[in-house]
């Protein structure tokens, strides 16, 4: 059975005087597993925060059976798209409302990931973090198609321009990943997982390293990353969900 050893979460706006359009789901027990997520409302449109809140509220309502079917991720995104589309019923100006969403469900056999947009999932591997999801941005699409190398786009515009999000107007394109525990667990049976919005991972990627003891501890990681973000001055709303899980029975942890 999967156990939650520790977790740490933060979410704060780019500026204290403006609304935070990120919405966060801290690790939540769902059946025998744990569900966590970040939704980043697309800030250039009215209703961005309502769209991200709508996505998280739907995830909170889910029962364990929602994650069992082979098309579970698709069904979840379809239902959230319906709810985001219906936001126009409460305010016609929300017609263009959109949000990204990245969620992880750590179940009995592995971690199921559903991803739309440009939040990211990272896993700790040895002494570094490995990016698991792909950004749904124009830059990443050009790289995937072999038209450019990452170094060639470093100074080009459009880095944060999305080609997929959950919206009434956009065709839904999502990434689904399943990671078995025997693929990702450390030798002690633990898994360290991180979900970050773009406001959090851009400062991380400027110097993607902390002491291994910091990577092992969600609270220390969150505190250090937050200090870095504040020191560099936030460029967007900033959100992090960091967790450490184990597949070992509780008694084995003290052997």
Model segments located where?
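PP2C/PPM-type serine/threonine phosphatase catalytic domain
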Residues: 1-255
């Amino acid at each position: 059975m999967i156990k939650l050893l520790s977790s740490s979460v933060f979410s704060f706006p780019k500026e204290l005087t403006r609304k935070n359009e990120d919405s966060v789901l801290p690790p939540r027990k769902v059946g025998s597993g744990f569900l966590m997520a970040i939704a980043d409302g697309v800030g250039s449109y009215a209703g961005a925060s309502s769209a991200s809140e709508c996505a998280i509220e739907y995830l909170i309502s889910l029962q364990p059976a929602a994650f069992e079917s082979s098309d579970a991720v698709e069904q979840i995104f379809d239902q959230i798209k319906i709810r985001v589309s219906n936001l126009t019923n409460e305010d016609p100006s929300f017609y263009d409302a959109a949000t990204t969403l990245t969620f992880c469900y750590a179940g009995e056999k592995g971690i199921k990931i559903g991803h739309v947009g440009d939040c990211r999932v990272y896993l700790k591997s040895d002494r570094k973090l490995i990016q698991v999801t792909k950004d749904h941005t124009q830059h990443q699409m050009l790289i995937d198609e072999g038209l450019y190398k990452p170094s060639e786009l470093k100074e080009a515009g459009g880095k944060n321009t999305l080609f997929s999000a959950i919206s009434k107007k956009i065709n839904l394109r999502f990434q689904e990943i399943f990671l078995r525990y025997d693929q990702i667990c450390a030798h002690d049976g633990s898994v360290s997982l991180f979900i970050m919005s773009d406001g959090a991972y851009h400062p991380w990627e400027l110097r993607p390293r902390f002491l291994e003891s910091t990577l092992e501890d969600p609270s220390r990681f969150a505190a250090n990353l937050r200090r870095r973000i504040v020191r560099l001055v936030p460029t967007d709303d900033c959100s992090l969900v960091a967790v450490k899980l184990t597949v070992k029975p509780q008694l084995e942890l003290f052997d």
